[in-house]
A protein has these predicted regions:
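Residue-level preference for alpha-helix termini and adjacent loops
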Residues: 23-25, 32, 73, 106
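Short acidic/polar alpha-helix capping motifs at helix-coil junctions
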Residues: 7-9, 48, 71-73
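Envelope-exposed proteins and targeting segments
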Residues: 12-16, 20-22, 29, 52-54, ...
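Periplasmic peptidoglycan-binding/anchoring modules of Gram-negative envelope and division proteins
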Residues: 3-4, 25-60, 87, 121, ...
Length: 137
């Protein structure tokens, strides 16, 4: 399962933040997806394939161990691993609005180091979805 929460993203856009019960977490210095993460992503892929007007952003994060540069690289690789897996599950490349790593720039002090080795996914209404809603479709 997953929790969804309406949020403002880093660009102050309305988004739905998707948090999976199992988390999309990674081992130290790794961008390899766990079986739990793959199962969660397969469920997300089904939703994204049903509504191809939904765009997503994938943001990779790290703990604070190691250099800034190393953490930026690992966080990007984590985001790319999620993007590649979702594409392997049939999600259209056009749905990926943003795929990036932020290293430990957005480190969450309320989480443990292992919980900060994560990827966060945001879902957005596409331009077409917004136009359809405004037109009453």
């Amino acid at each position: 399962g997953a929790q969804v929460e309406m949020v403002k993203d880093a660009n102050n856009l309305d988004a739905v933040k998707v948090t999976f019960d199992s988390g999309i977490l990674f081992a130290f210095n790794s961008s390899t997806l766990s079986n739990d993460a793959k199962a969660s992503l397969r469920d997300l892929a089904k939703i994204l394939k049903e509504d191809t007007t939904t765009d997503i952003a994938i943001i990779g994060h790290t703990d604070k161990v190691g250099t800034y540069e190393a953490n930026m690289k690992v966080s990007k690789n984590r985001a790319y691993a999620v993007e590649n897996y979702l594409q392997d599950c049939g999600v259209s490349p056009s749905q990926f609005k943003q795929v990036e790593g932020v290293g430990y720039n957005e480190y969450d002090e309320s989480l443990s180091a292992s919980e900060n080795r994560r990827v966060v996914i945001f879902m957005y209404a596409s331009e077409q979805m917004i136009k359809n809603a405004e037109a009453g479709k």
